[in-house]
Structure formats: structure tokens, C-alpha cells
A protein has these predicted regions:
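Long, acidic (Asp/Glu-rich), low-complexity accessory segments flanking structured domains
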Residues: 2-119, 126-205, 209-377
Length: 377
């Protein structure tokens, strides 16, 4: 074949090859552009979701709860032990929506603090060896089901700056009770959490309350002794934190332990021996969570309080009748630490002093003397 005949064929093949390369390049470019658009849309969705939930909480809880005030040593009802009170408690305190395919945000913590909540429950995970707050509906240490997380350092900073300030909390001198449920076995994360707590030494309880208060029941201490302080409670469902001595210095109490129980609401509602639970809660404490699920209803505070349970953890983003009743209960009490009724508090059994003996009835040796004799009988 002549050279002149080959050139058109070669040119055609070259053109086809170039077209294929251009087509592949366009496909790759289009795919990259599609991914970028998806990422931008995802970021916009998350931003709008966070903004929507924060706006919702702000609309409901934007102002300070004027019905709640700080405990005071001038009120005799504030002079009892910690376990003799109901605590106003928020469940998953950084959550403003459901626990799956949703977001967490620090704005939700600020909102519940404005309402006077002093019991704060968190679910803590490990990301890049750092403790973070998120939520999930599965009992798995490797899965969080929220799109984002909140660093625990931001949680502590918010507690320091908002929980103890009169402009952001109506009861700013009341103690804060932090309850943590760990979803990790990462010891490096636990060490980093200990380092974080160390930077808040002045806010936390002293060394006499380290290592679970050295086996003593912190609930048996006077409520007023914890004013302006943070009490740390870890849940023993995951005991990995017990291996970290540095962190144990900051653990004042544990739930699912001898001094404190943890229940889902179902287990309180269907408890076969409520009288035993009432007796237990007279000297110890219990925390009650909503039942499992991505968007559960709140516990019935009336039933849980009747069982003597001190911390009935509420979902403040779920405005149902149970939340409204719980809010009304603490508003009427005017404290976030509301004294339990007398029949649900421990009263030690005392034995009255013995009647003094009549010396005339004594069997001791005595002397009998007359003008005629003297002898001992």
C-alpha cells in the first residue's frame, strides 16, 4: 500500500484514539465534579440541619428559666444529702435531634443549661485518640451514627463558662453532675481525657473524692458541700476506664455499681419489686434513661420519681407531655435539686436511751447498820 493511502487511515486511527482519550478525560472530570457537588451539598445539608436544630432549641429555650434558682444554705430544704434529691437531668445533652443520621451541637448544651439542668449525660467516643461526644442506636464501640461530633474539651469549656455564670444559667452556683457513657476501649483517649480534666482542677472535686471516693458513697455527702463544683460519674457498662489510673483520679462515682444503678425506663416501669428499688434509692442513687431507639419518647418522671430515682434523664428536644410535666415539677419546686418526700428518704432506726436504773433496786453490796449491828448484804 502506498504512503498516500496509509496517511488517511493513520489519521483516522489517531483521531479515534484522541476522541477516546478526550472521552475518558471528560468522564473522569465529570465524576470528580459530581463528587465535589455531592460534598458541597452534604456540607450545606449538615450546616442547615445544625442551624435548624439550634434554632429550634433557641426558640423554645432561648431565655433563662426564671422559675429555677440556686440552692441556698438559708433554706432548710437544701440541707440534706445528695441522694435525697431529684436532679434536673438532660440525656445526651449535646443532641438536638434523633440519635441516628443526625447531628450534635454545643448549642443544645447551652440551651439545657439555660433551663437549669444540672445533671448532664453524654455518650463519649474516641476519634483520633481524642474524647468526643456523639450518639448512636447500636451498642458498638466503633460506630457512631451522627454525622459529626463535639469535642469533650468544648463541652468542658462550655460548662465552665456557661454553667457557672448568672447570665447563662439561672442556678449558676449549683453543682453540675456529669454522667458519661463510654463507647471506646482506647486507653490513649482515656489518658487525653485525664489531661483535659487536669486543666479544670479548680472546678472538680478534691483528691478526697478520687478513685470513686475511695469506696465511699458520694451520695451520702451534703448537697451544699458541692456548690460551684462538678461531680464526675462514669458508667460501668464499659469498664475500660478503670485501667487508667490517671483518669481514675477524677472519678467521683460510677453508675451500674453498688452505690448507683442505671436503668432504661422500660426496666423501671416493669420492675417486679418497686419497693426494693425505693429502699435502695433511700441510701443510694439511680439514673433513668429513655428507652433505646433513634427517637424515643421521654421517661415518665412521675413513675420514676415515685420509685425514688434521683436522675430522670430527659430529651429536651422531644417536647412531649412527659417533658412538660417534668419541667413543671422542677419549676414548682423552684430548684434543680428538689428534695424527695420524707417517705422516700432514709431515716435511720434509732433506739431510745435506756431508762436510768433505780439505785434502790441495785444488787450491789450495801451496808446495813443499826445501834446493835453492822454488816454487808
Amino acid at each position: 500500500m502506498s504512503e498516500t493511502a496509509k496517511n488517511p487511515i493513520n489519521d483516522a486511527l489517531s483521531s479515534i484514539t484522541n476522541m477516546k482519550e478526550d472521552f475518558i478525560s471528560n468522564i473522569i472530570l465529570g465524576f470528580i465534579l459530581f463528587i465535589v457537588i455531592l460534598m458541597i451539598a452534604y456540607i450545606i445539608y449538615l450546616t442547615k440541619l445544625q442551624s435548624k436544630e439550634c434554632s429550634f432549641m433557641e426558640d423554645i429555650y432561648g431565655s433563662l428559666n426564671g422559675n429555677i434558682r440556686s440552692i441556698s444554705d438559708s433554706d432548710p430544704d437544701c440541707g440534706y444529702n445528695l441522694n435525697e434529691y431529684y436532679f434536673k437531668t438532660a440525656y445526651n445533652a449535646c443532641s438536638g435531634g434523633s440519635y441516628k443520621n443526625d447531628v450534635v451541637d454545643i448549642c443544645n448544651l447551652k440551651a439545657v443549661l439555660k433551663q437549669g439542668a444540672r445533671g448532664l449525660d453524654f455518650e463519649v467516643y474516641s476519634i483520633d485518640n481524642e474524647p468526643v461526644v456523639a450518639t448512636s442506636t447500636v451498642d458498638n464501640y466503633y460506630i457512631k451514627e451522627t454525622y459529626n461530633s463535639v469535642s469533650f474539651s468544648e463541652v468542658m469549656s462550655t460548662i465552665k463558662n456557661y454553667a457557672f455564670s448568672g447570665s447563662t444559667a439561672p442556678n449558676f452556683t449549683d453543682p453540675i453532675v456529669i454522667h458519661v457513657r463510654f463507647m471506646s476501649n482506647n486507653q490513649e483517649m482515656y489518658s487525653n481525657l485525664a489531661t483535659l480534666f487536669k486543666s479544670y482542677d479548680t472546678l472538680l472535686l478534691g483528691k478526697e473524692y478520687s478513685y470513686e471516693t475511695f469506696g465511699h458513697n458520694v451520695g451520702g455527702e451534703p448537697l451544699l458541700s458541692f456548690m460551684n463544683k462538678v461531680i464526675i460519674i462514669f458508667d460501668r457498662s464499659n469498664i475500660a476506664f478503670l485501667e487508667n489510673k490517671d483518669l481514675m483520679e477524677y472519678v467521683n462515682m460510677t453508675s451500674n455499681s453498688i452505690f448507683m444503678r442505671a436503668y432504661n425506663y422500660y426496666d423501671v416501669k416493669n420492675n417486679p419489686d418497686l419497693e426494693e428499688l425505693r429502699e435502695y434509692n433511700k441510701r443510694n442513687m439511680s439514673i433513668v434513661f429513655p428507652d433505646s431507639g433513634s427517637n424515643p419518647v421521654n421517661p415518665n418522671g412521675i413513675l420514676a420519681r415515685d420509685a425514688g430515682c434521683q436522675m430522670v434523664a430527659m430529651r429536651y428536644q422531644m417536647v412531649d407531655n412527659y417533658l412538660l410535666q417534668n419541667t413543671l415539677f422542677f419549676d414548682n419546686c423552684s430548684y434543680a435539686f428538689c428534695l424527695k418526700p420524707e417517705h422516700l428518704r432514709y431515716k435511720p432506726v434509732t433506739i431510745p436511751d435506756a431508762t436510768p436504773q433505780d439505785p434502790a433496786l441495785s444488787y450491789a453490796t450495801r451496808n446495813v447498820t443499826t445501834d446493835f449491828y453492822s454488816f454487808d448484804v
